[in-house]
Amino acid sequence: MKKLISGIIAVAMALSLAACQKETKVISLSGKTMGTTYHVKYLDDGSITATSEKTHEEIEAILKDVNAKMSTYKKDSELSRFNQNTQVNTPIEISADFAKVLAEAIRLNKVTEGALDVTVGPVVNLWGFGPEKRPEKQPTPEQLAERQAWVGIDKITLDTNKEKATLSKALPQVYVDLSSIAKGFGVDQVAEKLEQLNAQNYMVEIGGEIRAKGKNIEGKPWQIAIEKPTTTGERAVEAVIGLNNMGMASSGDYRIYFEENGKRFAHEIDPKTGYPIQHHLASITVLAPTSMTADGLSTGLFVLGEDKALEVAEKNNLAVYLIIRTDNGFVTKSSSAFKKLTETKE
């Protein structure tokens, strides 16, 4: 009888323990933001301090706030108000988020030797890759020269040494476009919110810009595909890497472009010439501590082209993966830092 009672107690205790141990779930959230889509996945083992519904609401609020500050398409955004302001050399107060993103863009302008320039917007718009409508014909040299005179990181002054950051412009026509880095910042903001909610394993993606931490439900680093450029427009995978505790972003010329008289014009503009880039680099993927940094670097390094991008990457210990177009198809190259990271992270 004692053995029977002991057995019943043991079974009851086992059932009680099983009930206490909550099953780990994969929470998937998605939506639209910044003219594209976002996807968030995180593991919830019962330790997350908010419901998935509440988390989704907070993510939506974060992304709405980023858009309200940095969109060039919203006429009432903080960025648009600065662009519409025609006063020169007159500092205006800007939000801490705006200042943070702009400060990183200015830093990356130096790293990329001028290739990432957030003041290139007037020229981008002239080519039809911004809020302005696409022109029926290629801009004339005179049109380009006029707008090129408005471009240059030296045309803006950011002051973060006071309690409130300020920004001023040297010319009335100066126009700042943060689309090359704002999505990455949005990713980082969402990631920080997940960490505040005690999420230790997550993946955040906005329009291809990514940040991941921890492991997926299979206990492996988050598996992220690098897209392979194709001549048909179909999606294909070039490589898959395990991403853990870092950001990732890619830039390429195989999706957004237009053709005129048989000539292909990519959407990335070289701020030094005012013309769409002309080289054989089809895409570049960058790994960095934050998605914002990866986002900005991928744009700037892509503008530089395959040889210069790899040179800058090696010089600055940047993790980059390049897909290069040749007469016989595509070839790949990667920096020393990329090889080291993927060898240890996969």
Swiss-Prot record:
It is found in: Cell inner membrane. SUPFAM superfamilies: ApbE-like. It is a lipid-anchor. Belongs to the ApbE family. Its main location: membrane. Gene3D superfamilies: ApbE-like domains. Keywords: Cell inner membrane, Cell membrane, FAD, Flavoprotein, Lipoprotein, Magnesium, Membrane, Metal-binding, Palmitate, Signal, Transferase. A lipid is attached at C20 (S-diacylglycerol cysteine). It comes from Haemophilus influenzae (strain ATCC 51907 / DSM 11121 / KW20 / Rd). It holds the Pfam family ApbE. GO terms for cellular component: plasma membrane. This is FAD:protein FMN transferase.
